[in-house]
Amino acid sequence: MFACLRIGRFIRLGNVTVKSTNLVLRCVFIRNFATHADHLFDELPQRDLSSLNSQLSSHLRSGNPNDTLALFLQIHRASPDLSSHTFTPVLGACSLLSYPETGRQVHALMIKQGAETGTISKTALIDMYSKYGHLVDSVRVFESVEEKDLVSWNALLSGFLRNGKGKEALGVFAAMYRERVEISEFTLSSVVKTCASLKILQQGKQVHAMVVVTGRDLVVLGTAMISFYSSVGLINEAMKVYNSLNVHTDEVMLNSLISGCIRNRNYKEAFLLMSRQRPNVRVLSSSLAGCSDNSDLWIGKQIHCVALRNGFVSDSKLCNGLMDMYGKCGQIVQARTIFRAIPSKSVVSWTSMIDAYAVNGDGVKALEIFREMCEEGSGVLPNSVTFLVVISACAHAGLVKEGKECFGMMKEKYRLVPGTEHYVCFIDILSKAGETEEIWRLVERMMENDNQSIPCAIWVAVLSACSLNMDLTRGEYVARRLMEETGPENASIYVLVSNFYAAMGKWDVVEELRGKLKNKGLVKTAGHSLFI
């Protein structure tokens, strides 16, 4: 309030000069007063590049990426000479809007104007390309950074983690350690999350030991450590981390521990922890996520009762969790009832309901809800997760025509960039329909894009399609690509390629591959049965 009064007095007294206003704009930007920033910006008799940069940052910080791009276009038309500080918020806007082509055009303009040289601008480029899933470009930009600082290293590590490349993220961390880069709590937290996602116990314990030995702030890393031990099934170790923090624990840590107990079916401890605090939406939502993972309907219903008693059932986030839980437990009627009762449905609400029908094998109903969402009256636009759920539903239900329509709509109508999982699901749809020519045209279009390599998961999907449709020639090409790109030490790929040749009746090749697998001492991670 005091800051607002000072800004008002500044404007009223007429002390509006370029230099003085730039200083106030920076202050307003830091405090995130977007309206005041707009007012000050409009009052300027002259606008220099510094004030324009501040306004760009203000728009982005206020969550208005479209306004950021619109202002940037005006600046570029009026002043062709731009600084690296001008481009940084623009790259952030491109990242938020998922406009790969626009992002590349901005990058090209940076190179043309010599604004790509700074570490800050290159870090923004690394972040932008990783959000597009273009990790090859992220690595290329990172390698061009002359003075790599902690922020640029963290941007690369986060990019791999964001795209599900856990092993590569750990490789970045190992390189940071070799290069003696000063590692922050953020870095360690990211690495712990990677270990949790990959369920790598030994490396996670090593990071925990590093935290203790180097005297890092365990309060900052506590939630990540609790989540890690919970994910690998060591709930007692998670309890030890929580108890070691004593008075420094917070609600987020407790919620993480409760969720971990439920995921590991330690219900007695979970409800004991719940009794230590007043029930809240956050802890109930995280607990419902555990019930969804375990398909535990009885515990989910108990949590639903707690939510009803405390008047939380009007909260959209909690309702989304309830829908997901009932859907995963096969209770589609209850999920639908909760969905219809939500007054203001978010994109998560719609997606959760679509997914509930999808996981229960009703692709037609899933499409019905999706079309209802896309109607103008809903006021909600589908995102990439929504399309992944819908395309997956079409794949499982064998809805080829509808799957094609959804995949095309994603790119053309909503300007969303399909990710690896979208392509895998779409290839599965085409494969079951026997449309191998369409699959190959899709692969050829992807190969024409030299800036992005085709992920291994897509090649695996194409190989499965070749196997299903008895396409030996193309299957052999894909098999060679997989063997080349994953390296000679990947046992799973050897088995996958071997199974392809077995389906083709090429038993001599199968025997040769199995022999190589044995001679190299490679062992495929074995599956397990819940019954045997």
UniProtKB/Swiss-Prot annotation:
* Targeting signal (transit peptide) range: 1-33
> Which InterPro entries does the entry mention?
E_motif (IPR046848), Pentatricopeptide_rpt (IPR002885), PPR_At4g14850-like_plant (IPR046960), TPR-like_helical_dom_sf (IPR011990)
GO BP term, example: RNA modification
Which portions of the sequence form the region Type E motif? 458-532
Subcellular location(s) of the protein: Mitochondrion
Matching PROSITE patterns, A to Z? Answer: PPR (PS51375)
Its main localization is mitochondrion
**GO cellular component terms listed in the entry, alphabetical order:** mitochondrion
Q: Which family does it belong to?
A: Belongs to the PPR family. PCMP-E subfamily.
**UniProt xrefs under NCBIfam families:** PPR
Name of the molecule in the record: Pentatricopeptide repeat-containing protein At5g66500, mitochondrial
Originating gene: PCMP-E38
